[in-house]
Curated annotation (Swiss-Prot):
Transmembrane region(s): none
SUPFAM superfamilies assigned to the protein according to its UniProt record, in alphabetical order: RNA-binding domain, RBD (SSF54928)
Pfam families in the cross-refs: RRM_1
Primary role: Binds the poly(A) tail of mRNA. Appears to be an important mediator of the multiple roles of the poly(A) tail in mRNA biogenesis, stability and translation.
Extra remark beyond the main annotation: A.thaliana contains 8 PABP genes.
Name recorded for this polypeptide: Polyadenylate-binding protein 1
Alphabetical UniProt keywords: Cytoplasm, Nucleus, Repeat, RNA-binding, Translation regulation
GO molecular function, one term: poly(U) RNA binding
Annotated organism of origin: Arabidopsis thaliana
CDD domains per UniProt: RRM3_I_PABPs, RRM4_I_PABPs
Keyword Transmembrane helix among record annotations: no
Cellular component GO terms held in the UniProt record: cytosol; nucleus; ribonucleoprotein complex
Subcellular location field: Cytoplasm; Nucleus
Amino acid sequence: MTLEPDIYLKKIIREQRRVSTIRTSENKFEKHTLYIGDLDSSVEEGDLYTKFSEFTHDISSVKVCCDRNTGLSLGYGYVNFNHSSQAKTAMEVLNYCKLKGKPMRIMFSERDPSNRMSGRGNVFVKNLDESIDNKQLCDMFSAFGKVLSCKVARDASGVSKGYGFVQFYSDLSVYTACNFHNGTLIRNQHIHVCPFVSRGQWDKSRVFTNVYVKNLVETATDADLKRLFGEFGEITSAVVMKDGEGKSRRFGFVNFEKAEAAVTAIEKMNGVVVDEKELHVGRAQRKTNRTEDLKAKFELEKIIRDMKTRKGMNLYVKNLDDSVDNTKLEELFSEFGTITSCKVMVHSNGISKGVGFVEFSTSEEASKAMLKMNGKMVGNKPIYVSLAQCKEQHKLHLQTQFNNPPPSPHQQPIFSQVVAPATMLSQQTPLRGYNFQPYSMCGSRMPNSCPPISIPNFMVPQPFRPTLYPPAPLVGLYGSLPQPLLQPNLWNPYRRF
């Protein structure tokens, strides 16, 4: 079932085209805070810290939000990280993991309430089987783009209400998912998928009085329009449009006094056959709005046509371990059906790029493999499996990503590219605050980095900061360098060499 572009889809299209200006503020700063939702009422801050510290020790603070009056948990909290890269990885690993029997729903914290309440990128899914949880709902829709959050609505006893919500990063993913998944049979139930529209927006969009009527007979007059639509309410004007010679253009407009009458007229008269002509009745729009709808419909049908051509048989696999080759990749997916082609992409020197493609003989086999293999640990990495995108869809996706770059990892200081001989290396052990390197980085090497170079007879004055930590070893291009013994009380930041 195809979702026809309407007023709600048109609104999404306009937001998609100006997304670069809407979301600019989101990317000014790195995101270090994760929102943890759907927490059990008994979860405390210590429980949350213990759960996340199993994955990383890069945690700066933990907070479980409680009611100000009763002190009871509100069912959500926050975890702050020192590095945004650690926050992103923790979200990917721990999202939907259980804490005290309930799966956590994790996403980046959004401090701007206008963005939280905008409903941008949201999809409404109903007629879900009661056995489908948040994780399974996310797996169903992750093939259409980056998913920020998934939630299945439940009653007080924890039983599914049969509907849920999926929030995408890109609005393009919204109507692609709606057209591909709407009417799909999932666990013996046909699900209904559509863009989420708040009750306020829905009511506001229905407030109109002017109706457009197309495919009239050439002999139709203004009086015929009034007679045809008069039963639905009082009409203020009705006109059949004519060309310069006075001939009917076979369409016209009917303006009602009340909006309810206009809505009823569309519902009752659209598709009705009058004088052997099937009428098309809808809300009257400006020419610019109609042009946007036609463009949106064309772009949407092109994407759906390409997806139907491929029939969802080609899968895109990323985050592959370097040890995975064509044979290994085929072995991983062979249990789900007949594989027609399998390829791991490599660089010119033969090293794996960490991505590949697997094409099945049927879309059912590909869907089964995607649901089962997405997030599965292969080697030491979880692989991510989605439907391979057509060229045009991939181009639009890249354009969206370019306009909305994700938060970049925390940048470490980059030192000079020049490699100094060992005799020129500083013989002073860096203290905290002066070229100090955290213990988590000891024995490792940052890309494009080398030890700081000591310039003879020159030292940048730095205030002395006493520390309780022992000095960390210098890290060279090939690991830790041998450290000279440093006698106590000989360190002087103002000393000249």
